[in-house]
Regions:
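Cytochrome P450
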Residues: 1-424
């Protein structure tokens, strides 16, 4: 069913969330724009971004209020992921081969995959990797102390999640650089550092990155069928107690989801954490002065403030009224977690970074519902472990310049961040 495109909301004719130019603005300007959008009586409508992949569709509604993001998340029967959750335009079929993971599915297909995957994360495996996280964070800080001033992203925040997720899956160190490079390509947004500015070339780069990752997991899975190991690829490539297992295509697309999501989001949160703790020395002191009691609240505040994933898309399955707003079958909506996490109706003084903020019902891991972030527990452990090592061993570590931000509407990324610290 196609719905005729409504006219764009005239109240925001100077704001266009579909244009790269908007996402190149200074964060303060974007905050101000979203604050204006949240004042509107109804979710604003935007035309689809222009792309050579497809002809633009009928546009989408931007859910910018916390209540709307939460309501859409908890009603997956109305707000479906099946037409794609990570692209505002409907992608051509060849993308589904590598990126058709469970993030782009509804139940019962989504429930089946999530069940198989959840069972692969056994308590023993989780315990093993929790120990590895702390040990890896300590080794990274050892290297930082030996290196001195450096790019924090390259030397610290990118290293921890990359090593943990690769080792969890069973990928050897020789493949780490390839995995990082392909992750950067897949999540490049419109950033010319990682992706060609020629759109046809850029599409080829993204598909090649997906194909390379799929080939890697297929090769490792075949090896694990012969010689099993204590890793996730072995667990996912063999049947569980109910005789369920992932098909090779499901394994490849899940692997890409897990490695890409498990890499970029924690890296983004840690990079922004250093910026925030540099800009708010009072919050740094507060956290260091009672680290173990304050760190869990601080992690939630970092995830709220950063919102590593800016939005996800849903498609409306039937005519429905949600929070007083009429939606038609076929409508597209974008759930702007970044804006919901700054909603003045929910968070007092939302632009203030407060490590003691409570309550903190942020949607930085997605809203409640079946698509709540599968890796939230691991991400929290990684951020906690890295900040414990950094702040307790190198309490003066600080950013020395403005972050070099990723040009993307989807990931609130930092590409480079120079840092330094006082030598003891």
């Amino acid at each position: 069913v196609t719905t005729p495109a409504p006219a764009p909301t005239p109240a925001v004719s100077d704001i266009d969330l579909s244009q790269n130019e908007f996402w190149a603005l200074d964060p303060a300007q974007r905050h101000a724009a979203f604050a204006r959008l949240r004042q509107l009586d109804a979710p604003p409508y935007f035309a689809d971004p222009e792309t050579p992949l497809t002809t633009p569709g009928q546009g989408y509604y931007a859910l910018v209020k916390h209540a709307d993001v939460v309501e859409a998340s908890r009603n997956p029967d109305i707000f479906s992921s099946a037409r794609g959750a990570t692209s505002l335009v409907d992608l051509p079929p060849e993308f589904n081969e590598y990126f058709g993971s469970m993030i782009n599915m509804d139940d019962p297909r989504h429930a089946r995959l999530r069940r198989i995957v959840s069972r692969a994360f056994t308590p023993r495996m989780i315990k093993k990797f929790e120990d590895d996280v702390q040990r890896t964070a300590a080794a990274i800080v050892d290297d930082l102390l030996a290196t001195g001033p450096c790019d924090f992203v390259q030397h610290v925040s990118a290293r921890l999640p990359l090593k943990i997720i690769c080792e969890m899956m069973g990928i050897g160190q020789g493949h780490f650089a390839m995995v990082l490079r392909n992750t950067n390509t897949i999540l490049a947004g419109g950033d010319p550092e990682f992706l060609s500015e020629n759109m046809d070339e850029a599409i080829g780069q993204i598909l090649t990155a997906g194909a390379d990752m799929a080939a890697l997991v297929t090769e490792i899975a075949a090896e694990r069928q012969r010689v099993p190991a204590d890793d996730l690829i072995t667990a996912l490539a063999s049947a569980n107690v109910d005789g369920e297992q992932l098909t090779p295509a499901e394994l490849a697309s899940f692997f890409i989801l897990l490695v890409v999501a498990g890499n970029e989001t924690t890296r983004t949160a840690l990079s922004h954490a250093l910026v925030l703790l540099t800009e708010h020395p009072d919050q740094r002191e507060l956290l260091i002065s009672d680290f173990e009691n304050r760190i869990s609240g601080a992690v939630e505040e970092i995830v709220r403030y950063v919102s590593p994933v800016i939005w996800m898309r849903r498609s409306v399955t039937r005519d429905a009224v949600v929070n007083g707003r009429q939606y038609r079958e076929g409508d597209k909506v974008a759930l702007f977690y970044w804006s919901g996490n700054r909603d003045e109706a929910v968070f007092a003084d939302p632009l203030r970074f407060d490590v003691t903020r409570s309550p903190n019902p942020h949607v930085g891991f997605g809203g409640t519902g079946p698509h709540f972030c599968l890796g939230a527990h691991l991400a929290r452990r990684e951020i906690t472990a890295m900040l414990r090592e950094l702040l307790l061993r190198v309490p003066t570590v600080r950013a020395t310049a403005e972050p070099d931000r990723l040009l993307s509407s989807f990931i609130n990324g930092i590409k480079h961040l120079p840092c330094e610290f006082d030598r003891a």
